[in-house]
Amino acid sequence: MASIERNIIKAELKQMREQGCNTQEIEIRILESIDNENCEDSEFISLYEELTSLPVDPSFAFDEPSTLEEIKALRPDARRHFERARNGVPLDSDTLYDCVYGAWLGRAAGCALGKPVEGWPKARIDEYLKEADALPLDNYLPYIKKQMPRIHIPSSRDNIEYMDRDDDMDFTILGLLALEHAGADISARSIANMWISKMPFAKVYTAERAAYRNFTQSIWPPKSAAHRNPFREYIGAQIRADIFGYVAPGLPERAAQLAFTDASISHKKNGIYGEMFVAAMIAAAFITDKAEEIIAAGLGEIPANCRLAGAVRDTLCWCQQESDWEVVWGKIYNHYGHYHTVHTINNAALVVMGVYYGCKDFELGIVSSVRAGWDTDCNGATVGSILGIVFGAKALPHKWVGVLNNRLISAVSGETDNQISDLAQRTVQLIDVIALGPKKTCDRLLEWDSGGMWELETGWGPQCLDFGTGTIEFKNDDFGPYSLTASNFQNPELHFSFSIDKDGWDFEVDFEGSINADILEGLFYPGEIPVHGKKTLP
């Protein structure tokens, strides 16, 4: 079996070139190695390490950091907090629910519309629609046998009975679960643990699959975002943004910060910015129905001089100049069509186009963003989500949302068959939790260099955790002591890991929780095993 480096080095070469590195010299050697059938995997590993160590060329015209502090420092001036009101009218609980329910419904409708033609270019979509006598498109896509895979029949016109399973919806649910678990104290590690606990590996793709693979090798955020991951600027983080905007109405900065935490487990640079941009737009859509203001809120949370910001500004300008979305699509294609079909930048431009034309016409918004091609289900879902907030569930066209029958299927463990209204209600319940911000850190710091001994009560029975010796012991079963393989304390958050020898293979356990004075609370992963502890010795 070929090494992973051999399989992905061409994608990494393109990524490094796009992020501003001078790859001319190493590209020659990489292509020669690819052409050499006898080239050893060790050579590809060496080339890959050299390639990913290249610095950004000083002539690169953009500033694109990947830490939250650096991103914040490079943002343009913008309004980051709004009163929870639209047009001067406070958003009461009923209105908030209508907006959030509209967001979930709109996201599902846009996703279902784009799902059957995911990855198709605009020309192929239009050719299909002409053959189906479905232009102009004013409903879901008809099914044409032998041209549309049978797997997409549940998302085709006259065949929709629910929102079929799609990763664009799976990740919205995963984000909801992570927020229900940790609230505003959500961390990259807690999200990673949620993926492992709830999401099958085979149901994630590109950057998410690379990150998930890294988790299984104990490569955790933020390193998981870059290690052997040439897809780190693809759209995968952007499609995970929505839930973080839903829970932060009127708070684009808070939404973007939550989105950063999520994005940082699998993405870098513009991959991160895409999720922050969308989350901030969603937060603003609760407050204003003006496309320019929604888009400005998104731009306000990402570096002013990054490639994504340039593409957004270009697209907004073209939309303001043109009444025909297809003319704007042509300009987007000419300027940004060189990016991969599922890259963040080109697809974000289509989202901006869909939001601009859709703020007064839900159907036009999702139809234009899907007919434009590229990552159609992702873009339709994001545009539908934003417009669902703008219009609210009650005002969404029945032909687009009624056929879903308030039902959403997912691959998320324990959440496979959902009532969309229930998901919306669970989301609303988090809004005030998120508005309060992270919990106050405990008054007493743990003396970490002498972390002491702790008696734990867990779903696996009593254990003794000793930071002095760096071990954990299962008291009733005579298992251990096992050495801690990693530990980290950032008041009040505590993480530690250990491995259980299973007769020749190691079963890795990860603890995630917090300490308040002499009390420890958290969970063991995998399995979400409750852990309660009390310090017994200093």
Regions found by a protein language model. Name each.
Residues 76-93, 212-235, 241-255, 259-373:
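Accessory "access/gating" subregions that flank catalytic or transport cores
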Residues 1-45, 49-59:
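Long, charge-dense tracts
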Residues 155-191, 195-204:
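Aromatic-rich carbohydrate-recognition surfaces in CAZymes
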Residues 73-109, 113-170:
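An N-terminal structural lobe/cap that precedes and organizes the functional/catalytic core
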Residues 183-235:
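Extracytoplasmic mature domains of secreted/periplasmic and thylakoid-lumen proteins
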Residues 109-115, 120-136, 267-270, 277-279, ...:
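Catalytic phosphate/nucleotide-handling subdomain of diverse soluble enzymes
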Residues 448-515, 524-537:
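Central antiparallel beta-sheet cores of small beta-barrel/beta-sandwich binding domains
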